[in-house]
Amino acid sequence: MSSSRPVFRSRWLPYLLVAPQLIITVIFFIWPAGEALWYSLQSVDPFGFSSQFVGLDNFVTLFHDSYYLDAFWTTIKFSTFVTVSGLLVSLFFAALVEYIVRGSRFYQTLMLLPYAVAPAVAAVLWIFLFNPGRGLITHFLAEFGYDWNHAQNSGQAMFLVVFASVWKQISYNFLFFYAALQSIPRSLIEAAAIDGAGPIRRFFKIALPLIAPVSFFLLVVNLVYAFFDTFPVIDAATSGGPVQATTTLIYKIYREGFTGLDLASSAAQSVVLMFLVIVLTVVQFRYVEGKVRYQ
């Protein structure tokens, strides 16, 4: 089997074509990452005018800080809830629209609405609905004797930010899952039905394995979303409270850097978060992708 390679008249043309992307990557990714790594090894005054090299002291201080360790485990718990819940709920709705619900066009449009809402607005929307005194949902819960106050209950606060974050991401996941389900050849589904396989068995034995590549892609995307893009939700909904119950690493970095003006500690936390995401992504590609079959 022969393969052809593109031939350019100028040897500089390939480099010129990739130059814009390389410039963007260097300016907005590599350079900031390098700056964060450099500042994490320094002791910097609050205004950033002077610094002193301290090596790994900032990292040693971090991992002896109980508040930071709490934020670390809160991030793991929060990102797991958001990623798993977001994927399962989106897949459930995509399967409903594809196989069960009539008038799917209306439901497709309805499912896309959260994508048009900014994360902070999504948080404010659910704050109104879960308002302890006047919220519609809290009034409904009170009818069953359940007292809701996420400003004082850490479990309820975590549920609120997870719920708002998942709701915001449902549309994105739904689009990919629905497109993947539509791409499955109907002949496979019909053949399984003729053989006596029910809807549930057809879904788990045929549809789910065939959409595994899309599921893996969304797993990586949702994990990154949970680590970084949920900051506006947490900031608007709980501000990391109560008692830091919803303070994730990204929110603690913001507090340390912009409120506490501790640039060195904030940079060290950024480096730890960056390496954590890199490790999780590598693990996913190494062990999860190996079980995905691309057709």
UniProtKB/Swiss-Prot annotation:
InterPro entries: MetI-like, MetI-like_sf, UgpAE/MalFG_permease. It is found in: Cell inner membrane. Residues 1-11, 102-109, 178-207, 284-295 are cytoplasmic. Keywords: Cell inner membrane, Cell membrane, Membrane, Transmembrane, Transmembrane helix, Transport. GO terms for cellular component: plasma membrane. The chain crosses the membrane at residues 12-32, 81-101, 110-130, 157-177, 208-228, 263-283. Residues 76-284 form the ABC transmembrane type-1 domain. Signal peptide: none annotated. GO terms for biological process: transmembrane transport. Residues 33-80, 131-156, 229-262 are periplasmic. PANTHER family: BLL4140 PROTEIN, SN-GLYCEROL-3-PHOSPHATE TRANSPORT SYSTEM PERMEASE PROTEIN UGPA. Part of the ABC transporter complex UgpBAEC involved in sn-glycerol-3-phosphate (G3P) import. Probably responsible for the translocation of the substrate across the membrane. The complex is composed of two ATP-binding proteins (UgpC), two transmembrane proteins (UgpA and UgpE) and a solute-binding protein (UgpB). This is sn-glycerol-3-phosphate transport system permease protein UgpA. The gene is ugpA.
